[in-house]
Amino acid sequence: MMGYKITIKQGNLLECEADIIVNASNTKLLLGSGVSMAFKRHCDKALQEAMNNVLKDAKELRQGDVVATKSYAKNFQIALHVAVMNYNKGVKGLQKMPTLKTIEIALKNIEQFLKAYAKNKQKVKIALPLLGCGIGALQKEDVIRIYKNFFSRDVAFDCEVILVGYRDEDYNIIYNIFRDLP
């Protein structure tokens, strides 16, 4: 069996060299603020058009859903958009916010994508931000513990996961929670 190899980095998620970079998005796939705004600035404006086309095909996304588009960037091929915030019609107030269950669902959906993507690849490299910890207001420690539990399992493909903490303090929290992994 193979597993996930964890690398922890501090800095700008979009400067990572990877096959796939995860975008903390929303159910309307709008490149708005936070990580999504960074995608908007880093990738060509064609990214939003591609996201709009994916949403047309999907009709409606739920929190935790994952969709892929071309990245339109030089340092990674695929942008994997995770619906973290719920901006669907009729959703108000706190109902827009993610829960830890949203993160668990998202990780399972990311893994399904990785499994299919890895079929004809030696190794896959994915960069991941702290989903739900910006506008979503989830506690970083809680999300990182979910990551640790999820990524410490064996899987049938070879994948390096780059966990990116934007600030020094984020990096330190990730490092301290992950440091006892082999």
Residue locations for each model-derived region?
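Macrodomain-like recognition of ADP-ribose-binding/processing modules
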Residues: 1-182
